Regions:
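Solvent-exposed loop/turn segments at secondary-structure junctions
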Residues: 86-89, 125-128, 144-148, 250-254, ...
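Beta-sheet entry/capping signal
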Residues: 78-79, 138, 243-244, 301, ...
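A conserved helix-loop-strand patch within extracytoplasmic ligand-binding domains
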Residues: 103-181, 452-528
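Extended intrinsically disordered, low-complexity coil regions enriched in Ser, Thr, Gly, Ala
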Residues: 51-56, 91-95, 146-164, 327-328, ...
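N-terminal hydrophobic or amphipathic helices and topogenic motifs
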Residues: 2-77, 82-85, 103-115, 167, ...
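Ligand-binding "clamshell"
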Residues: 89-109, 255-291, 439-454, 470, ...
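Gly/Ser-rich catalytic serine loop of serine hydrolases
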Residues: 37-38, 64, 145-147, 229-230, ...
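Short helices/loops that flank or line small-molecule/ion binding pockets
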Residues: 65-81, 85, 89-94, 132, ...
Length: 729
């Protein structure tokens, strides 16, 4: 942060135990606001607004909010809007000096200390002898996984010892929670998707059906339901036999017609004198009195670091000015960038570290809500440092957002090493290309449980051959003697589909074994087929040399190590994977690249900012059709080598149904959470400039696999052809 200074000492405050001096400067300043890259245009529009404050906002793009937290810590950015869950991630970061300096409050309750307070409401005449005697009551809840109606009572009752073991090893974290509620309460209403997987959801609702008995539609036990949500809890309590309800204070006051913040009392048919707040110590408080909360959810706010705290008053003024302008002009950037709207306002708070901010609301243990021992994890097997970093970032983001089990990360050198680790219970999952899934099933006793989804195509994609538009190739026969670029050995688009095409056209003979050697001879100009030198693939040395001849290793390395990773089957080889194979073609190493249908559109026309791709145009490339001729890159449905199944997540076949279910649940949950809110964590897309880490960049979601699809069956036929000549182990 650049500035010239004439300062007056104002105060000294503590952030995370550090004494930080605050100053008010007489000169204007520049503040770097971190924003997800998708919102840069909106942010720049906001930054261009003229305000009374002469401070300047500069927009700093980041992949997502997780990267914004890192940028603020590293002084690459000055501030960003954050949720309490992001504050939790920040508070757990080593050697951090973050500070929450402003809250986003509602106009309805501008003086409220917290966004909302979780309370328990009971009938006034209910006979209870302390909190332990709530066992057997009929309980009303907002919905599964929600804060005041689910996470807060579960966490606090566990801490009190009212709820027992939540770590039965044979049950998933979610089932442990549901079983605890089912055992504690005789009946309840807890609507919602108990699992994002429909099969698991139905199974759990049959097993713990008493948790749906107080709902409007017990058989459905899902939204919409008149006895769900904040107000629904109170209807359940007042009119459907409920004896205790878990909701938030503002809705209690509205339900009984009491004043709320700036809103005066309203008429109500409900009598507050018939009910009471049940306090965590077992005492009671009248509904008309000061409520006793079990925990509170803090406000959203803005977070900075210790350096910016010194001049934060100037930044606060700037935000206030922008809020006024944005509201007056109904500017879209107000909500998109500052996360404010016509029902909220920015409010200065006493500067405080994010951990202390959460503790003030008794909210830290609500976020953590991880029961054990044993502490369960889903161990993702990764192949390089980039993938390891993404996995660890995913783990932090998912845990803060209530996704269990926690993800852990296991680093191995090769895909085969990962498959061995999963087989031997050293890891739990890895995402594999369809061709490698077949290998995993046959040689490592693994099974696919989750499928990537690709937009309108769903769980499938097209394998294509790409050539430069100015090349002379018109058919696969023309490719004899050419130079070829492949995604990797054994992979669908880069190896299996082109090999099948050459066999199908009799360009490689059915008895020309081994086929991998025949492929190297067909593309006698040389190839880059990453993974060819991996001993696990058992490719003869001379053949492997030919198939690796065009690979470049890490072509971007400047330290003399570029060839150390030559022909590796991961991102340490620049020409590995879909993007890598296309780069091999672009940079003149090859004449043809075997990739998937979205590879060219995803790396041209400004879609990939890397230097080698920044100026590429999709119109300069065409698809080579297996039946002859060429087609534009967007006509893949009529010009492709194969219509193939998606990449899939595999796990060990030896796992129990319960263990598989909890892995499915965690994966489908991250797919939904971070597809709906990619600004929080970008699950699909490049990470630190690297492509296809953990999942393919082109994926748009994750779904459970319960049976073989028609595309998988068709692909199995393709595999049976290309595997007919495999060298014997």
């Amino acid at each position: 942060m650049k500035f010239t200074v004439i300062v007056v000492l104002l105060a000294a405050i503590a952030v995370n135990g550090r004494l930080i001096r605050r100053y008010r400067r007489s000169t204007h300043n520049e503040y770097k606001m971190c924003i997800p890259e998708d919102l840069m245009n909106s942010c720049n529009e906001m930054a261009s607004q003229e305000t009374k404050s002469t401070a300047k906002i500069v927009c700093i793009p980041a992949r997502d909010r997780m990267e914004c937290i890192d940028k603020i810590k590293q002084r690459q950015a000055d501030f960003a809007p954050v949720d309490p869950e992001d504050m939790y991630v920040a508070a757990k970061s080593p050697n951090q000096d973050f500070a929450v300096f402003e809250e986003i409050r509602t106009l309805e309750e501008p003086e409220a200390e917290f966004r909302y307070e979780g309370v328990a409401v009971i009938h006034k005449d209910l006979k209870l002898d302390g909190i332990p005697s709530i066992k057997g009551l009929k309980s009303c809840h907002t919905g599964v996984g929600r804060n005041v109606g689910y996470k807060i009572p579960l966490t606090k009752l566990k801490n009190m010892g009212i709820i027992g073991n939540l770590a039965e090893p044979d049950l998933s974290p979610r089932e442990n929670e549901l079983k605890a509620f089912s055992t504690l309460f005789s009946k309840a209403c807890i609507v919602g998707k108990w699992s994002p997987d429909p099969v698991i959801n139905d199974k759990l609702k049959q097993r713990y059906s008493n948790l749906c008995e107080l709902c409007e539609d017990p058989a459905k036990c899902d939204y919409p339901d008149k006895y769900s949500g904040y107000e629904g809890v109170l209807r359940c309590l007042a009119h459907n036999g409920g004896e205790i309800g878990w909701t938030k204070v503002i809705y209690v006051r509205k339900f009984f017609g009491l004043p709320v913040g700036t809103t005066p009392a309203q008429p109500s048919n409900e009598n507050p004198d018939d009910y009471a707040y049940l306090c965590p110590d077992g005492s009671r408080v009248p509904i008309t009195g000061t409520p006793c909360r079990w925990a509170a959810r803090p406000w959203q706010g803005y977070m900075t670091n210790a350096v910016v705290v010194k001049t934060v008053d100037e930044l606060r003024t700037k935000i206030a000015n922008l809020y006024t302008i944005g509201n007056r002009n109904h500017a879209p950037w107000l909500e998109k960038v500052l996360e404010l709207n016509n029902k909220t306002l920015p409010r200065e708070n006493k500067i405080i570290g994010p951990g202390d901010y959460l503790d003030k609301a008794n909210y830290t243990d609500v976020v953590e809500r991880d029961y054990g021992p044993p502490f369960k994890t889903t161990r993702f097997c990764v192949l390089n440092q980039d993938e390891l970093e993404k996995c660890r970032t995913l783990s932090r983001a998912a845990f803060s957002r209530n996704i269990r089990p926690r993800f852990d990360c296991v680093l191995e050198k090769t895909v085969d090493d990962c498959m061995k680790a999963i087989r031997d219970n050293g890891a739990d999952i890895i995402t594999l290309d369809g061709g490698l899934v077949d290998k995993a099933q046959k040689h490592y006793n693994l099974k696919p449980i989750i499928s990537e989804v690709y937009g309108e195509l769903g769980g499938s994609y097209y394998a294509v051959a790409v050539v430069r538009k100015n090349s002379l190739y018109k058919s696969f026969a023309d490719l004899r003697g050419a130079k070829s670029c492949h995604t990797g050995y054994g992979r669908t688009a880069g190896y299996n589909a082109p090999l099948y095409t050459l066999l199908n056209q009799n360009l490689i003979k059915a008895d020309q074994c081994p086929y991998v050697a025949a492929l190297s001879e067909y593309f006698s100009g040389g190839s880059c087929l990453p993974g060819s030198k991996d001993p696990a693939n058992k490719i003869p040395e001379k053949t492997a040399e030919k198939l690796c001849s065009l690979c470049g290793g890490n072509v971007d390395a400047n330290d003399g190590t570029s060839l150390d990773s030559k022909c590796n089957a991961d991102s340490t080889e620049s020409y590995s994977g879909y993007t890598g194979a296309f780069r091999c073609l672009v940079q003149g190493q090859g004449d043809v690249a075997f990739v998937k249908h979205v590879t060219v559109p995803g790396n041209t026309d400004g879609k990939n900012p890397e230097s080698w791709a920044a100026n590429l145009k999709s119109e300069d490339y065409e698809l080579l059709c297996p039946d002859g001729g060429r087609a534009p890159v967007d006509q893949y449905e009529k010009c492709h080598l194969a219509h193939v199944p998606p990449h899939m997540v595999v796990t060990s076949n030896s796992k129990t149904d319960g263990e598989v279910d909890e892995i499915r649940n965690a994966l489908v949950s991250i797919g939904k959470q971070f597809t709906d809110r990619s600004d929080l964590f970008k699950l699909f897309g490049s990470f630190n400039g690297k492509k296809d880490l953990l999942f393919k960049d082109s994926a748009t979601g994750l779904v459970s696999l319960n049976e073989e699809s028609p595309v998988q069956k068709k692909y199995a036929e393709l595999l049976s052809v290309i595997n007919a000549c495999q060298p014997k182990a």
